[in-house]
Amino acid sequence: MTIQLRIATPHDAPLIHDTYGHYVLASTATFNEINPDVESHAKDIRTQLDTYPYLIAEDETGRFLGYACAEPFRPQTGYRYVAELTIFLAPDAPRRSGIGRKLYRALLPFLTRQGFRQVLAVITSTNEASLALHRSFGFTEAARLTSSGYKHGQWLTSVWMVKQLNDFDPSPAPITPFRECRAEMEVRLAALNAEA
């Protein structure tokens, strides 16, 4: 299988809705118990692409395999140098086939280039595959919130994994919005997609 990456568009919202909805209903990978509607997902894509990368993985036939994106960690502006990551594979996508790794090989260097200092992923403690993926990219556990969520009749623990991308300059340059460097991401994706 060949994994191809591209930048998301609002037209991807139905696929993202269906994928995320699977995890909302059938897993504890997200603590969300309600899947936003398709238009909400489309709005999120439009909004996030202003500042953050939002990537889609497909196979050589164009079949949707999954997505990864960055978003604000918290709404307060003092947190603007930290991005929170989301990554989900389509329910029928093959596991342990490199989809998540390829998405992060594109996403993390680009967030570094934009000037983010840290990225954070909040992962359910029982999601060993996601924990292993993040560890393999140099994420470390920053916090463990025991029984911080309740879903499907059970208490769940969340693990906060953090990776430093850039130094903590006392006078950091502003984050470069994604809209201003999208062409660079297109070039990076073309190079990654050309790899065997």
Labelled PLM ranges:
Residues 4-16:
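A short beta-loop-alpha structural element at the N-terminal edge
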Residues 111-123:
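Conserved GNAT acetyl-CoA-binding A-motif
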Residues 174-196:
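Short, cationic low-complexity segments
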Residues 69, 120-123, 135, 140-157, ...:
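Conserved catalytic-core motifs of GNAT/GCN5-like acyltransferases
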Residues 97-98, 169-179:
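Short, charged, solvent-exposed linker or helix-capping segments at domain edges/interfaces
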Residues 96-109, 132-136:
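Conserved acetyl-CoA-binding loop-helix of GNAT-fold acetyltransferases
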Residues 17, 21-44:
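Conserved GNAT-fold acetyl-CoA-binding loop/helix
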Residues 36-94, 104-105, 164-166:
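Acetyl-CoA-dependent GNAT
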